[in-house]
């Protein structure tokens, strides 16, 4: 019986390198599946893992096959139904076996279902927020916001095969073999010198010569038994996440909770803010978040009240903007903080208040913030607030606005608002 002894120190997750390669190869299909899956989740279940399905034809492997040209003769099993030049009808409906569940039942045909596999929470969030960043982030005097980046950190004795250092492993192998065989090689060299002297001496010393030859053979066998490479020699490139200091930042979340916002609209707004919160907490450290709810009056609240409070009322959007301006002046000096804001509303506002919102943003907030995003969640025609904000968008580069009609628009809009920009930071 043959026994295999696994001496690897990293016995767990032995197929991790294959899994990572698979995720890289089919990233486009996986991201498409994730963008579709996120719309089906509840607000509280956004950050868990996910079952991802990929069409079978998208994961087909390259293969060699015969070309279509040329003259070929083949021998096929005989049958009593078809003769040469007969045409075989294509199966109808589901008979083709595509696995999609479409069409009618058939007694023949075959195919494969979509490939389904599970990704972890970390893999899910990495793909969810890939290529996203806070726009116009500038390094200020006080650095408390920390972004983690991967850096080389020497070598380690365990790791995945993809990170193995061939040169360092061979150097360790040479050093080990030299250390283990140095004494034997010196002894071998001395025996070979003695053998040469005895072989040339007169009279011949056959017994002594035979003994030396036997010892030399044993020493050479011992030296050859030292393995060329051992798990002890293996070295892997080590990577670690190091804090990369950046500028401190604050995000203002302004949510309309007026009576015109029905429950489904509020749920879509909450989904957007949950994505924003996960993105900030996943990508940056020590980002401060200020939550503001407003109807006719605005109030700064904590995270729990922001997402779960049932308070409602009329609509005066400027109350939230005024409160944000007060908080900025009181706690967040624009010279030391990167200030961001994300506002969500259904666009329904008191008509006389919309010009005031334009004035507050243009004169007080937009000159001091790095980026201000506005999303309007409605299926109705845009009203005065949207039109006032359109003037701001044409004037200020750090103002962006998007329209969300239904749940499927949330994630694409979020990526559009926070995709990485190559533009230089605002001074």
Curated annotation (Swiss-Prot):
UniProt-listed InterPro entries: UPF0229
Gly residues composition-biased segments: 92-102
Region feature Disordered, mapped onto this chain: 79-110
Chain intervals with Basic and acidic residues compositional bias: 79-90
Pfam families: DUF444
Superkingdom, natural source: Bacteria
Family: Belongs to the UPF0229 family.
The protein's name: UPF0229 protein YeaH
Protein's organism: Escherichia coli O9:H4 (strain HS)
Chain's gene name: yeaH
């Amino acid at each position: 019986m043959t026994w295999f002894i696994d001496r690897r120190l990293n016995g767990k997750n032995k197929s991790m390198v294959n899994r990572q390669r698979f995720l890289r190869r089919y990233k486009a299909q996986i991201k498409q599946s994730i963008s579709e899956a996120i719309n089906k989740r509840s607000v509280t279940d956004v950050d868990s893992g996910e079952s991802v399905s990929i069409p079978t034809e998208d994961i087909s492997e390259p293969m060699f096959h015969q070309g279509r040209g040329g003259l070929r003769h083949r021998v096929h099993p005989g049958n009593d139904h078809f003769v040469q030049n007969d045409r075989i009808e294509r199966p109808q409906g589901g008979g083709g076996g595509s696995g999609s569940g479409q069409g009618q039942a058939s007694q023949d045909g075959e195919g494969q279902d979509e490939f389904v596999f599970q990704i972890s929470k970390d893999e899910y969030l990495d793909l969810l927020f890939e290529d996203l960043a806070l726009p116009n982030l500038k390094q200020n005097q006080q650095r408390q916001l920390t972004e983690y980046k991967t850096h080389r950190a020497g070598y380690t004795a365990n790791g995945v095969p993809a990170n193995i250092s061939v040169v360092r492993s061979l150097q360790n192998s040479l050093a080990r073999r030299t250390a283990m065989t140095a004494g034997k090689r010196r002894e071998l060299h001395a025996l070979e010198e003695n053998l040469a002297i005895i072989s040339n001496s007169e009279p011949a010393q056959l017994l002594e010569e035979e003994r030396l030859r036997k010892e030399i053979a044993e020493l050479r066998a011992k030296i050859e038994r030292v393995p060329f490479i051992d798990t002890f020699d293996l070295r892997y490139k080590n990577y670690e996440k190091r804090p990369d200091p950046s500028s401190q930042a604050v995000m203002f979340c302004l949510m309309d909770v007026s009576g015109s916002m029905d429950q489904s609209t509020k749920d879509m707004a909450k989904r957007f803010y949950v994505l924003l919160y996960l993105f900030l907490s996943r990508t940056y450290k020590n980002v401060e978040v200020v939550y503001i709810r407003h109807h006719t009056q605005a109030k700064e609240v904590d995270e729990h009240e922001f997402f779960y409070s049932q308070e409602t009322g009329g609509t005066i959007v400027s109350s939230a903007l005024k409160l944000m301006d007060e908080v900025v002046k009181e706690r967040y000096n624009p010279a030391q903080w990167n200030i961001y804001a994300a506002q969500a509303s259904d666009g329904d506002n008191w008509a006389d208040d919309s010009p005031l919102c334009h004035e507050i943003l243009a004169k007080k907030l937009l000159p001091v913030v790095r980026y201000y995003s506005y999303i309007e969640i409605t299926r109705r025609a845009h009203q005065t607030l949207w039109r006032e904000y359109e003037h701001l968008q044409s004037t200020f580069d750090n103002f962006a606005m998007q329209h969300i009609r239904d749940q499927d628009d949330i994630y694409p809009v979020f990526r559009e608002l926070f995709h990485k920009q190559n533009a230089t930071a605002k001074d």
